[in-house]
């Protein structure tokens, strides 16, 4: 009996204290920032990768984004038939970066972060929804305010106030928007009829960016820096409302916006990116996420990918899909580097930019003596 009990205890001990396979040298050790060392925001952000959970995913996103920014064609093996001139130019060939975001992020203060990126030409292609276009212009005309998620809808409606999460947009803002945009539509229609101008969503957005002429607008900077902005859902929002009311005032063949030409232009951004690598940063899900990923499928996948959203994959939505699902479609390269950060982009994206784009901009300014 004693022998049997000893065997049982030994077995239990063996189960409880099962010998581990060594992780030394194969995995990063977990440890957070030590505030005894003082307050150093850059070191704090760098410590995210070893903190664990979504902090580590955010840290990985920072690393991958910096890899996008640092990649040069000269890092890759030189092909045998490469001319001397081509060899010299390889250092100047950078990664093409696609940035996608949903409209609520322009309603929020992330707009200013995106404006910074477009102002300094840090991204190459933008994709958003209609709200991501109109809210940028509306903010040049009137303010959005901080409210509460719990404000009663019926009460707000009676006061002419619209709620976006815990943001409040007075309905008067849209009246100002109509007063601003309708005369531009009138002129666009004249140019369509007299000059055979073919308007596409991206061409219309560039025109509006020119007309707003306001440095707080990311679309102004996109126009100024010739950064294409694609929005295949251009009618799904206040701009669609304005197009509808404009058509009522202009019966017959009114203003035409051709989305097919933009599909061609968007796909060509990816198809003809080579020899560049492509990187994608997508805030939120829905149309911007799929549109960017689908274009990159044309080149057998993006080389770098960062997703930041709170959507889950369990309903089969594209919004919630992890990067590995995109790999199965050829939207992210099977050899690419990708991460999803499960976090509100209003928290994660400014932190990411602080430790990637902004750091590199600051270093470049110091080198150039600015």
From Swiss-Prot:
SUPFAM superfamilies: DHS-like NAD/FAD-binding domain
Catalytic activity: putrescine + spermidine = sym-homospermidine + propane-1,3-diamine
Pathway: Alkaloid biosynthesis; pyrrolizidine alkaloid biosynthesis
Any one Gene Ontology cellular component term annotated for this protein: cytoplasm
InterPro entries in alphabetical order: Deoxyhypusine_synthase, Deoxyhypusine_synthase_sf, DHS-like_NAD/FAD-binding_dom
One Pfam family this sequence matches: DS
Enzyme class, first EC level, given as a word: transferase
GO molecular function annotation: deoxyhypusine synthase activity; homospermidine synthase (spermidine-specific) activity
Highest rank taxon of the organism: Eukaryota
Cofactor(s) demanded: NAD(+)
EC number(s) from the headed UniProt entry: 2.5.1.45
Keywords, ordered alphabetically: NAD, Transferase
Classification via PANTHER family: DEOXYHYPUSINE SYNTHASE
Family, per entry: Belongs to the deoxyhypusine synthase family.
Reported function: Catalyzes the transfer of an aminobutyl unit from spermidine onto putrescine. The resulting polyamine homospermidine is a precursor in the biosynthesis of pyrrolizidine alkaloids.
Quaternary state and interactors: Homotetramer.
Name of the protein in question: Homospermidine synthase
Organism, scientific name: Senecio vulgaris (Common groundsel)
The gene coding this protein: HSS1
